[in-house]
Curated annotation (Swiss-Prot):
It is found in: Nucleus, Nucleolus. Its main location: nucleus. Belongs to the class IV-like SAM-binding methyltransferase superfamily. This is Putative methyltransferase YGR283C. It is an enzyme of class 2 (transferase). The lineage of its organism: Eukaryota, Fungi, Dikarya, Ascomycota, Saccharomycotina. Its EC number is 2.1.1.-. CDD domains: HsC9orf114-like. Keywords: Methyltransferase, Nucleus, Transferase. GO terms for cellular component: nucleolus. The keyword Ligase does not apply. Coiled coil: none annotated. It comes from Saccharomyces cerevisiae (strain ATCC 204508 / S288c) (Baker's yeast). GO terms for biological process: methylation.
């Protein structure tokens, strides 16, 4: 009995040693925004679909992300390939032959693609992965998703002119495909080939989508990245949102540095009336995965906590890290938009 008691005591001491002292001194900061206009981009790791067992579950997760992004007028979604940053291989989902990164990016793009351009946007070999996506309700907050609205405006894709006619510049065209085998010839414009444009079908000219749709959300752009240096160019501030880490414990010593050296953002402060947008990038995911991704990246920052402008602390009812990434999105964006208003 004495041996058993001693063994339990040692285990208790070892467990206590792994934990940092309570009452960590957490830094807080007011994030200065030198603009009156704030735009948001989000970076979603491929680990967001690690627990999905089939295509239907993957599609639903992508739809949740897309719907939130449209509701909050997110400008861009970056899909971060973290297949090299996990200690364990993901479990296979049926007979999928494309990477999680490409699958997630394809689904996210599908949900903001106008119905009349679906046939030209996606390759036939990838349409297999869209069979579940077509069953979800369209995101009707986007004006071009509603066939009955703004009838004389159409989303189109510029296509090359017949090269046999010997046009002077093959990189430019005046032809725009608007779906259902309909092609509009622009009256007095030449535009680059394979460009997504908004067309006034009555005047037969390309117009600004902001003017055409009267300031309504226009959806987001999707791109893929495999390292943090591919992610971070072009943003004014970069913020980490701790999410998707159901074993996160701030008292563990391995999280000591991030808890004490990466400040929590208390609020935003607009110090300028400039109309030049401040672009804020929110990066979601586990700290451990991001650290391994950081080591693969060619960045000037000496450590990961220097890479970020700060981190977000959710309300007390939401445990740090212990929330699915797709559920953390609306909370994070609500907090930022409230601060910026």
């Amino acid at each position: 009995m004495a041996v058993k008691h001693k063994s339990e005591s040692l285990k208790h001491e070892e467990g206590a040693a792994k934990k940092a002292k309570t009452g960590l001194l957490k830094l807080k900061k007011i994030m200065d925004i030198e603009s009156n206009v704030v735009k948001y981009s989000i970076c979603i790791p491929t680990t967001v679909i690690d627990n999905c067992n089939n295509l239907e579950q993957v599609t639903f997760t992508a739809y949740q992300i897309a719907r939130t992004a449209v509701l909050f007028n997110v400008q861009e979604i970056i899909v971060l390939d973290q297949s090299k940053d996990k200690k364990h291989e993901k479990k296979s989902r049926s007979k999928e032959t494309i990477s999680d990164c490409l699958l997630l990016a394809t689904l996210l793009q599908y949900f903001v693609t106008p119905p009349n351009l679906l046939d030209t946007t996606f390759k036939k070999k990838n349409k297999l992965y869209l069979k579940c996506a077509s069953t979800f309700p369209p995101l009707n907050q986007l004006p071009f998703m509603n066939a009955s609205a703004e009838q004389h405006y159409k989303e189109g894709l510029s296509i090359a002119r017949d090269s046999s006619k010997g046009k002077s510049d093959d990189a430019l065209t005046n032809l725009v495909y608007i779906g259902k085998n309909q092609i509009i010839t622009l009256s007095n414009q030449n535009i680059p080939n394979t460009a997504r444009v908004t067309v006034d079908t009555e005047r037969k000219e390309v117009v600004s989508p902001i003017d055409a749709y009267k300031g309504k959300p226009l959806g987001y752009h999707v791109r893929m990245a495999s390292t943090l240096n591919e992610v971070s160019e072009g943003y004014t501030k970069i913020v980490w949102v701790n999410s998707g880490d159901f074993h996160y414990d701030e008292e563990l010593s391995k999280y000591h540095k991030v808890e004490t050296k990466l400040p929590y953002i208390a609020k935003l402060k607009k110090s300028s009336t400039s109309e030049k947008p401040c672009n804020i990038l929110l990066i979601f995911g586990k700290w451990g995965h991001l650290k391994r991704c950081f080591r693969r990246s060619d960045l000037e920052s000496s450590s990961l906590h220097h890479y970020f402008s700060g981190q977000l602390q959710f309300p007390a009812s939401v445990p740090q890290g212990n929330i699915p990434i797709q559920d953390s999105l609306p909370i994070a964006l609500t907090m930022f938009q409230r601060w910026a208003s």
